[in-house]
């Protein structure tokens, strides 16, 4: 085995979208034979015919019993995966030929209706809940849907509320796209959809081994939800593995084609998946490993780094990805996620109604007469201003309000830090160096620094001047170059990130002299 390189920063190389790059191969139970892989390197994927079928054998039947057999046995692993996107030594050197005399597994997805509109009963229930402990008048009046603009408006207590649908929602309503749940059931159309998903995952996750992606997408213990543009063009999807008895599912791959992004497909796809899973299974939680580029997406979809699910439930059952961040989503049982925009507006409307019942903040009073003559403005007692006393205002509040919450350079520092964190060369510097991985690092580097520590200091108002902020940024670059040799990738990453940082500082005239 080659010696480990010294490095600055925890983790391994990650890809830019979706999942992390480096895989620890899933290990099988003792009584389970090694499963065969499907070749993911073939380029002739669009001409899928009836002879493209996945294996079904006694090995598959044992694979399906994994959940009942117990956690993964770490002593029986027979495959090896190299780190950071290097070549993968798979279990078998030659892919098995696909058999055709197999028993067809019935798909569990046929009964799913991916409609994005609520029933009248659901709407009525939502209205009753939002109207609880208030008057019994209808919560929504004069609802108007503008299909051309993709907006919906309604009146509530005389106030107009509106929300705009994502382009993906509009396309679904117009019948241009659909969301299909598919698995490897030997049907020609489902195999074509799965192959389209495989191609997207392999393209969007370039550091992930192609044969590994193919094996999991075609694996019958996994399901996939695909975004399909009619007639049959796959533009993205999610592959996941359900553990019904343990009430959670593992999201294995999630990606949208690079040509179809920024249209809301990712968020709409996740909402469809949540509603489908809750409607067809006892699953209440999602778990997934996300790289640094995917964490933001998953946070927006309700995922968190705080894992509340008991380790005994999932440990040993999900695939472990080196360098990834484990995230969890707890699904709400009484929410239909496809209607989240309307539900949030209804909640806002109900809260505003409650506020109006106990406050006068909605009352608009006339302006002060003292300002009619701008040439002769006289001081006034604030307590004589109509409504101010009723709102609970005191002079002490004014003193607190006038204190600056942030330093004068905070906004510029925050923008610079965000730019640094999002740069492609920043991944080794996002977190402190792991002492267990690099034992002698803190003996050699006496003043360590990383981007997450800078973020904590910035949020704690510990940077009084821009010079202090730049000093810490320089610490990151100098520490890396001091510890790593010139020929290492980390040394080069530090140079790239420093050059980018200097260019960004120079774009701000009042600070440009600090990097000359």
Curated annotation (Swiss-Prot):
<feature type="compositionally biased region" description="Acidic residues">
    <location>
        <begin position="34"/>
        <end position="50"/>
    </location>
</feature>
<keyword id="KW-0805">Transcription regulation</keyword>
<comment type="similarity">
    <text>Belongs to the acetyltransferase family. GCN5 subfamily.</text>
</comment>
<dbReference type="InterPro" id="IPR036427">
    <property type="entry name" value="Bromodomain-like_sf"/>
</dbReference>
<keyword id="KW-0012">Acyltransferase</keyword>
<dbReference type="GO" id="GO:0005634">
    <property type="term" value="C:nucleus"/>
</dbReference>
<dbReference type="GO" id="GO:0010484">
    <property type="term" value="F:histone H3 acetyltransferase activity"/>
</dbReference>
<dbReference type="InterPro" id="IPR016181">
    <property type="entry name" value="Acyl_CoA_acyltransferase"/>
</dbReference>
<keyword id="KW-0539">Nucleus</keyword>
<feature type="domain" description="Bromo">
    <location>
        <begin position="404"/>
        <end position="508"/>
    </location>
</feature>
<dbReference type="GO" id="GO:0045944">
    <property type="term" value="P:positive regulation of transcription by RNA polymerase II"/>
</dbReference>
<feature type="compositionally biased region" description="Basic and acidic residues">
    <location>
        <begin position="51"/>
        <end position="69"/>
    </location>
</feature>
<dbReference type="Pfam" id="PF00439">
    <property type="entry name" value="Bromodomain"/>
</dbReference>
<dbReference type="InterPro" id="IPR000182">
    <property type="entry name" value="GNAT_dom"/>
</dbReference>
<dbReference type="GO" id="GO:0000123">
    <property type="term" value="C:histone acetyltransferase complex"/>
</dbReference>
<feature type="active site" description="Proton donor/acceptor">
    <location>
        <position position="250"/>
    </location>
</feature>
<feature type="binding site">
    <location>
        <begin position="293"/>
        <end position="296"/>
    </location>
    <ligand>
        <name>acetyl-CoA</name>
    </ligand>
</feature>
<feature type="region of interest" description="Disordered">
    <location>
        <begin position="1"/>
        <end position="136"/>
    </location>
</feature>
<feature type="compositionally biased region" description="Low complexity">
    <location>
        <begin position="97"/>
        <end position="110"/>
    </location>
</feature>
<keyword id="KW-0808">Transferase</keyword>
<dbReference type="Pfam" id="PF00583">
    <property type="entry name" value="Acetyltransf_1"/>
</dbReference>
<feature type="compositionally biased region" description="Basic residues">
    <location>
        <begin position="1"/>
        <end position="17"/>
    </location>
</feature>
<keyword id="KW-0010">Activator</keyword>
<feature type="compositionally biased region" description="Basic and acidic residues">
    <location>
        <begin position="18"/>
        <end position="33"/>
    </location>
</feature>
<comment type="function">
    <text>Histone acetyltransferase that acetylates histone H2B to form H2BK11ac and H2BK16ac, histone H3 to form H3K14ac, with a lower preference histone H4 to form H4K8ac and H4K16ac, and contributes to H2A.Z acetylation. Acetylation of histones gives a specific tag for epigenetic transcription activation. In addition to histone acetyltransferase, can use different acyl-CoA substrates, such as (2E)-butenoyl-CoA (crotonyl-CoA) and is able to mediate histone crotonylation.</text>
</comment>
<keyword id="KW-0156">Chromatin regulator</keyword>
<keyword id="KW-0804">Transcription</keyword>
<dbReference type="InterPro" id="IPR018359">
    <property type="entry name" value="Bromodomain_CS"/>
</dbReference>
<feature type="site" description="Important for catalytic activity">
    <location>
        <position position="250"/>
    </location>
</feature>
<protein>
    <recommendedName>
        <fullName>Histone acetyltransferase GCN5</fullName>
        <ecNumber>2.3.1.48</ecNumber>
        <ecNumber>2.3.1.-</ecNumber>
    </recommendedName>
</protein>
<feature type="domain" description="N-acetyltransferase">
    <location>
        <begin position="177"/>
        <end position="332"/>
    </location>
</feature>
<dbReference type="InterPro" id="IPR001487">
    <property type="entry name" value="Bromodomain"/>
</dbReference>
<dbReference type="InterPro" id="IPR037800">
    <property type="entry name" value="GCN5"/>
</dbReference>
<feature type="binding site">
    <location>
        <begin position="254"/>
        <end position="256"/>
    </location>
    <ligand>
        <name>acetyl-CoA</name>
    </ligand>
</feature>
<feature type="binding site">
    <location>
        <begin position="261"/>
        <end position="267"/>
    </location>
    <ligand>
        <name>acetyl-CoA</name>
    </ligand>
</feature>
<keyword id="KW-0103">Bromodomain</keyword>
<dbReference type="GO" id="GO:0140064">
    <property type="term" value="F:peptide crotonyltransferase activity"/>
</dbReference>
């Amino acid at each position: 085995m080659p010696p480990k390189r010294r490095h600055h920063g925890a983790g391994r190389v990650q890809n830019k979208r979706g999942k992390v790059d480096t895989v620890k191969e899933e290990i099988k139970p003792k009584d389970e034979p090694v499963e065969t892989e499907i070749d993911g390197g073939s380029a002739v994927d669009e001409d899928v015919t009836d002879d493209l079928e996945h294996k079904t054998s006694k090995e598959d039947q044992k694979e399906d019993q994994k959940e009942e057999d117990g956690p993964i046995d770490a002593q029986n692993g027979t495959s090896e995966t190299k780190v950071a996107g290097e070549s993968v030594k798979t279990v078998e050197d030659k892919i098995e030929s696909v058999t055709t005399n197999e028993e067809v597994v019935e798909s569990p997805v046929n009964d799913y209706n991916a409609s994005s509109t609520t029933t009248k009963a659901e709407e009525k229930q939502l209205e009753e809940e939002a109207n609880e402990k208030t008057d019994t008048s209808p919560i929504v009046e004069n609802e108007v849907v503008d299909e051309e603009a993709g907006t919906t408006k309604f009146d509530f207590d005389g106030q107009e509320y509106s929300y705009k649908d994502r382009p993906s929602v509009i396309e679904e309503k117009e019948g241009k796209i659909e969301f299909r749940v598919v698995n490897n059931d030997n049907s020609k159309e489902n195999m074509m959809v799965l192959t389209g998903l495989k191609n997207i995952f392999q393209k969007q996750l370039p550091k992930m081994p192609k044969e590994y992606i193919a094996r999991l997408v075609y694996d019958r213990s996994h399901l996939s939800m695909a975004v399909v543009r009619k007639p049959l063009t796959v533009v993205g999807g999610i592959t996941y593995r359900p553990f019904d008895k343990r009430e959670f599912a593992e999201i294995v791959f999630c990606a949208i084609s690079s040509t179809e992004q920024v249209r809301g497909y990712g968020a709409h796809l996740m909402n469809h998946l949540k509603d489908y899973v809750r409607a067809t299974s006892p699953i209440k939680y999602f778990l997934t490993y996300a790289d640094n580029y995917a964490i933001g997406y998953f946070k927006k979809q309700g995922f968190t780094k705080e894992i509340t699910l008991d380790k005994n439930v999932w440990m040993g059952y999900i695939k472990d990805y080196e360098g990834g961040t484990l995230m969890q989503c707890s699904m709400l049982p009484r929410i239909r996620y496809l209607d989240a925009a309307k539900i949030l507006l209804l909640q806002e409307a109900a809260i505003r109604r409650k506020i109006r019942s106990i406050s006068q903040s909605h009352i608009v009073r006339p302006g002060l007469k003292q300002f009619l003559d701008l040439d002769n403005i006289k001081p006034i007692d604030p307590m004589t201003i109509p409504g101010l006393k009723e709102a609970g205002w005191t002079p002490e509040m004014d003193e607190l309000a006038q204190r600056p919450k942030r330093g004068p350079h905070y906004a510029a520092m925050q923008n610079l830090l965000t730019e640094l964190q999002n740069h492609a060369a920043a991944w080794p510097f996002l977190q402190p160096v792991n002492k267990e991985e690099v034992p002698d690092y803190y003996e050699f580097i006496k003043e360590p620094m990383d981007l997450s520590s800078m973020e904590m200091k910035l949020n704690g108002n510990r940077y009084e001047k821009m010079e202090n902020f730049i000093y810490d940024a320089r610490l990151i670059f100098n520490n890396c170059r001091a510890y790593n040799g010139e020929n290492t990738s980390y040394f080069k990453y530090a140079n790239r990130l420093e050059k980018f940082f200097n260019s960004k500082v120079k774009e701000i005239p009042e600070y440009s002299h600090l990097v000359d």
